[in-house]
Amino acid sequence: RYSALPRMLLSVWMLPRTDAAKRAAVSSGGQEGAALRLSTLAEDGQLGRGALPRAVGETMTDLLENGCACVPALALDESGLLLERGCGVLVHGGLAGWLEGDAARGMELLEGQGTGTVELSGGRAVEVTEVRLRWTPEADGGRVTGAGLVCRLTARLEEGAAAPEKEELEGLERELAARSEGCIRAALDSLQSRNADCLSLTRRLAALRPMARADRERFGTWELTAEVRAEVTRGE
């Protein structure tokens, strides 16, 4: 008996329209086989070092329950090598747009991802090792009107880096927090401009405030605030 289950478990990526030469490079393997490259990207996502891979079934469920879905996107370089390109926002009518750059980084953080190396000023770099999120819904008149997010980042200086003084360490924490907060803000603004609740906030906030009604259609009008707190420790 035919079963669609294996197909529903396959990971899905989005790739923008590109020229024939680049498509041919991918078909011939490029610098490395497409299958191997996709496997590497999926593994990085599972380890929190990139966009979390999405299965076909998960994507379809998000479209049914949220009216939208955020799917990891890829781009091709001149040789046909597949590179991460943020994510695409799908709605029932098709592609609503892309999250790239800061917005893509913000989306990773909003999904509890985003671990890995972050370059900071002064030639410093930190490795984000943990991302924790806490949403607090806001309601008025029995209806959810917004939410506040507190995102806590734990990071450490890269191994071999000179130990900083306390004042410099605190400065790195402020810089990491401010930069990450800007990325989260960019992602939230992009999603709200499309009224695309790819974070399932409607259902999550309804569970946190069961006496208040959370309308998915009003997601774009909610007041969403974000605060990032970072803790940076000295590398061993």
Locations of regions flagged by a protein language model:
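A glycine-rich, acidic short-motif signal
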Residues: 1-236
